[in-house]
Amino acid sequence: MAGDTTITIVGNLTADPELRFTSSGAAVVNFTVASTPRIYDRQSGEWKDGEALFLRCNIWREAAENVAESLTRGARVIVTGRLKQRSFETREGEKRTVVEVEVDEIGPSLRYATAKVNKASRSGGGGGGFGSGSRQAPAQMSGGVGDDPWGSAPTSGSFGVGDEEPPF
């Protein structure tokens, strides 16, 4: 939305994402990302951890289910979302205000890891995406060379063989 404060966080999940469902059946996952800056200490000549920033995050519907199935405690993630301030009252009657991130996109950081991504299948019918509250399992990629246009050697006569000139 216009005027929202967007933020991108790179950090580690402090615990496994918590999948819950609202009374209307919408999936929601809550998790915390710890982002710790690295600071160079000129006196010692080495890098040290700065003070960690802990941000509470939430993501909804199908994306929430994908997060719960894919990410675990300690995973390094990249999160993009909108900062939201929320006020509430504790059981003791104290007023509290928290700042949270409503997640738009999340994924594993591949800086120090690898990942195999499986596209989530869509059920038949219209709508796909955040509007549908149905749960879909990840589709298994066959991985066969016939299905992957990049998985085989170029055919004869294609660009890139020998001393050919580019086709443009």
From Swiss-Prot:
GO terms for cellular component: nucleoid. CDD domains: SSB_OBF. Residues 117-168 are annotated as: Disordered. Residues 123-132 have a biased composition (Gly residues). InterPro entries: NA-bd_OB-fold (IPR012340), Primosome_PriB/ssb (IPR000424), ssDNA-bd (IPR011344). Residues 1-110 form the SSB domain. One of its GO terms (biological process) is DNA replication. Gene3D superfamilies: Nucleic acid-binding proteins. It comes from the Bacteria. GO terms for molecular function: single-stranded DNA binding. Keywords: DNA-binding. Homotetramer. NCBIfam families: PRK07772.1, ssb. This is Single-stranded DNA-binding protein.
